[in-house]
């Protein structure tokens, strides 16, 4: 019988029992594909990350899976939590990188920035520049999230599919009241996702009462088994790129996005648009540790 250590973290927060929950399993070698699926399903969180250090690549490697047997390739809470864990445990994950800081995910190099904040590592992850790759009629999305087309009117902005690592749907919502009353219709959103070629649906409003935040958001992605996610870095990056293209935010400036309020797991995602990509940043805290028996 093989024993693996695992950790549970709360991600995009500096408080336990807030943020987005993540299970991280330390492996010293690749597992069988079915084992990744089984372990992710056993934990039951939106994502489980599997981490190891590769001397061949001089890199910390991360793979992430959902309970519905999907592998996640984007730099979101799945990667942030894994890197924060390594830093909190003081694992030497950057040896051999000649002063650079990066990790491997799906065989792609993800550049990182690391500072300390409130006694915790504060990690930035670089995504690709945002690209608008499509649009979806408002009525289709309104039906899928239990709102009206009037609820989806904000500054005349379009509903666009925006991609950095992953193509998510950016859905402007009129105000906080409309955002709060959204109700997911899984089957309709799955149909729209398949027809128009987007992954998740990111509802956001800039019309809210919390002045410290750029936007308040909700994320639905039933196609990969996520009903509502408390924090979604792979969607926050595209949102920052979308708003910068509209001239609503500036390049080089830091902004904060609030997500997870309506599932009682408030999360804070910092975003910054640069010339060569988009930075997503945040903290994580370890909540528990255990052993997994294979």
Language model feature labels by segment:
Residues 1-75, 80-294:
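Active-site proximal loop and beta-alpha junction motif in alpha/beta enzyme cores
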